[in-house]
UniProtKB/Swiss-Prot annotation:
Organism lineage string: Eukaryota, Viridiplantae, Streptophyta, Embryophyta, Tracheophyta
Protein name: Pentatricopeptide repeat-containing protein At3g53360, mitochondrial
GO CC terms of this entry: mitochondrion
Gene designation per UniProt: PCMP-E86
Region feature Type E motif, mapped onto this chain: 644-719
Transit peptide residues according to the UniProt entry: 1-70
Keywords: Mitochondrion, Repeat, Transit peptide
């Protein structure tokens, strides 16, 4: 080395010399060799070592850095995204006697843009004595890459005013900025400029146009640009395949992959594999995915983090978790995204414990979980028994400071909702309510509905209105369901007016919700008016009104509407048949109902559910054909559930068939030993038939096994305020007055009835 220096030879860089940068620099004696050494390091992509050599040279010598070396150092900072070093070198340039020109300034602009310091870039740009096309393009690129599309567009217009003609690089940057701003009109103008200035043959501009049209959801335009490129490159194919995959044209994405492979010119990269595998996931076609997996192996990309991650996600979404795990284990250097995919795959397929186990492996492997990791893990905690595990995850979230992430807080809310802990839901929501978004509000409103707290839901909605968060169609759906829960037609009408005022009423989802609300609140006329006003009625619209008619006792109207639905060419679904079977039951059309039940599968391909079976049991039982109802249950292909047996039990009570009621109750208690309804109905039947001994035995059994009747609840609306009452409520603020009035009414009833009825009333009162 010393001989080379004495001879004034150019400095060449080897790996061994890189390991000892300081010692190498300390042996350099001339300014020329110092500059050559730094340039050589930069050229060999040893950016950190080049910057260290610069620091060492400045501290230990008075060598003058040349213009070309400054350019190399600035490029090193750009490539390594080292903003601090870039500023340091820029300051050194300003304080030196270096006569720097537009080329150096352009490199400085590019460095600041790539490092994300747009303020510095703009300051340099504004003070440049001379600016050329590269200067403008560098700053426009910086704005575009950092999500400031509007600023990029303003600067581009200023560039045109200075009579600078954009080249393909300028077009590439400004088209990307236009795509991020979602300005379709400007995008079309830029496309016209590309054609006018004959840049349409340049790949950079053309590929940018494809990406822009994909961003605008205009795949036909993207496809026209793609097929107008005479010599496509890998980016062209990658952009069009990604576009089709992202926008739901999965078969087209796979078709373009096949077309690309047929030319035999390009080998897919990890990004093309990722887009193609996403298409397979959306189609739920693991057979296609496994073929692409074979291509990945052939291309030696199966161990690549991006391709491996996509493979893992595809197998997990298609339910092949063992394959997903094998692919994950083959990834050479898994990153956080790879871990997140396998955790999400397990969680979304219901393997909560396995997801937690992989999460623990992730942490023990030295990876720090991010918000996606935690959200995926929380998705697995969907049952009350998972509450303890969910709380542990909550403690991790607090420990790692993720409570500031709103998406994580929303996932926590959802977890507590599924795990039936409304108290924790409320406490958590109050902690971040001031920062809540529409997802947060909708989640807490849904939680209230799921836990039968419609009045609390309405209170929270009023708070939402005074917040900065605007209700959306999901909010309206929750409100309408809440109105149904408390049977408040007045409140439902107010929600209807609010949806009209906010412009949400025209949405199909809202209209269907309004039909349901009006029907269940007893205003079938208004429900029908909304139905008739709809331009595009879907199966939900028809089914909702049919069910509404049926449940309100208008069976004939429901069946007429069902015929109209079939005439309109709308294929019924399982909900439709619940409605028509209920209608047949209410109007006593037993044979018609049995015929419809038979045609469900033969004509419409709908497999009967337990709900349909329950409707048939009700149909037969209401007609007094209890033995047929019993035989139907015994011959069911599905295992009868509590609802089916309860339907029979209720019918037995109406028909006074104690023997069959006993069988129904026993089957209910086999499934749910603590079911209070079975005990109470059977007890009531024994009392009604004068069998006081068996009634008393049942009552004693309930007390022994701590079986408690679910307290009834009712609402009353007085002066726009909803009052809620529970049976045996000890917390109501006016409970003493309420119970005094009830006691007086009860005493009056006992005084005015005959002795036989008096005994029955006393027993009912004692059994609750």
């Amino acid at each position: 080395m010393a001989t080379m220096l004495r001879l004034g030879a150019r400095v060449s860089v080897s790996n061994s010399q890189i390991l000892a940068t300081s010692s190498v620099v300390s042996t350099i004696k001339t300014e020329e060799l110092m500059n050559d050494h730094i340039n050589s390091l930069c050229k060999s992509n040893f950016y950190r070592e080049a910057l260290e050599a610069f620091d060492f040279a400045q501290k230990n010598s008075s060598f003058k850095i040349r213009l070309r070396t400054y350019i190399s150092l600035i490029c090193a900072c750009s490539s390594s995204r080292s903003l601090a070093q870039g500023r340091k070198i820029h300051d050194h340039i300003l304080n030196s006697n270096c006569k720097y020109d537009t080329i150096l300034n352009n490199h400085i602009l590019s460095m600041y843009g790539k490092c994300g310091s747009l303020r510095d870039a703009r300051e340099v740009f504004d003070f440049m004595p001379e600016r050329n096309l590269v200067s403008y393009t560098s700053v426009i690129t910086g704005y575009s890459q950092n999500g400031q599309g509007a600023e990029a567009i303003r600067l581009y217009l200023k560039m045109l005013q200075e009579d600078l003609v954009p080249d393909q690089f300028a077009f590439g940057s400004i088209i990307k900025a236009c795509a991020s701003s979602s300005d379709v009109g400007l995008g079309k103008q830029l496309h016209a400029q590309v054609i006018k200035l004959e840049s349409s043959s340049h790949l950079i501009a053309q590929n940018a146009l494809i990406a822009m049209y994909v961003r605008f959801n205009q795949m036909s335009d993207a496809s026209r640009v793609f097929y107008g490129i005479p010599m496509k490159d890998l980016i062209s194919w990658s952009s069009i395949i990604a576009g089709f995959s992202q926008l739901g044209f999965e078969f087209e994405a796979l078709s373009h992959l096949k077309e690309m492979l047929s030319f035999g010119v390009f080998h897919p990269n990890e990004y093309i594999f990722g887009s193609s595998l996403k298409a397979c996931s959306s189609l739920l076609r693991p057979d296609y995915g496994s073929q692409i997996h074979g291509l990945c192996i052939k291309s030696e990309l199966a161990g690549n983090a991006i391709a491996g991650c996509s493979l893992c996600d595809m197998y997990a979404r298609c339910g092949f978790l063992n394959s997903a795990r094998r692919v994950f284990d083959q990834i050479e250097r898994p990153d956080t995204a790879s871990w997140n995919v396998i955790i999400a795959g397990l969680a979304n397929n219901g393997y909560a414990d396995e997801a937690v186990s992989v999460f623990s492996q992730m942490r023990s492997s030295g990876f720090i979980p991010d918000a996606i990791s935690l959200r995926s893990l929380l998705c697995a905690q969907t049952k009350p028994m998972a509450l303890s595990q969910g709380m542990q995850i909550h403690s991790y979230i607090i420990k790692w400071g993720f409570l500031a992430d709103l998406t994580v807080c929303n996932s926590l809310l959802t977890m507590y909702t599924f795990c039936s802990d409304l108290y924790c839901c409320f406490n958590l929501f109050e902690d971040f309510r001031n920062n809540a978004d529409s997802v947060s509000w909708n989640t807490i409103l849904t939680a209230c509905l799921q836990h039968e707290q419609p009045v609390e839901m309405l209170r929270l909605f009023k708070l939402m209105l005074v917040s900065e968060c605007e209700p959306d169609h999901i909010t309206m759906g929750n409100l309408l369901r809440g109105c149904v829960e408390i049977s408040s037609l007045k409140l439902g009408s107010q929600v209807h007016c609010y949806s009209l005022k906010t412009g949400l009423a025209p949405e199909q989802f809202i209209k269907n919700g309004l039909i349901d609300m009006y029907a269940k609140c007893g205003s079938l006329g208004q429900a029908r008016r909304i139905f008739d006003s709809m331009d595009n009625r879907d199966v939900v619209s028809w089914s909702t009104l049919i069910v509404g008619y049926a449940q309100s006792g208008f069976g004939e109207e429901a069946l007429i509407l069902f015929k109209e639905m079939k005439s309109a060419g709308i294929e019924p679904n399982h909900v439709t048949f619940v409605g028509v079977l209920t209608a047949c039951s209410h109007v006593g059309l037993v044979e018609e109902g049995l015929k419809l039940y038979a045609t469900m599968q033969t004509e419409h391909g709908i497999s009967p559910t337990k709900e349909h079976c329950s409707c048939v049991v009700d149909l037969l039982a209401r007609a007094g054909r209890l033995n047929e109802a019993e035989r139907f249950i015994d011959e069911m292909k599905l295992e009868p559930d509590v609802v089916v047996w309860k339907t029979l039990l209720s019918a037995c009570k109406t028909q006074g068939n104690v023997h069959l009621a006993q069988k129904a109750a026993e089957n209910i208690l086999k499934i749910d030993p603590f079911n209070s309804t079975a005990h109470v109905l059977l007890c009531s039947m024994h009392a009604s038939s004068g069998n006081w001994e068996n009634a008393a035995l049942l009552r004693s059994s309930m007390k022994k096994h701590d079986v408690k009747k679910i307290p009834g609840q009712s609402w009353i609306e007085i002066e726009d305020k909803i009052h809620i009452f529970f049976a045996e409520d000890i917390f109501h603020p006016e409970r003493d007055d309420i119970y005094t009035v009830l006691h007086n009414i009860w005493s009056q009833m006992l005084d005015e009835c005959n002795p036989q009825h008096k005994k029955r009333l006393q027993f009912i009162h004692e059994t609750g």
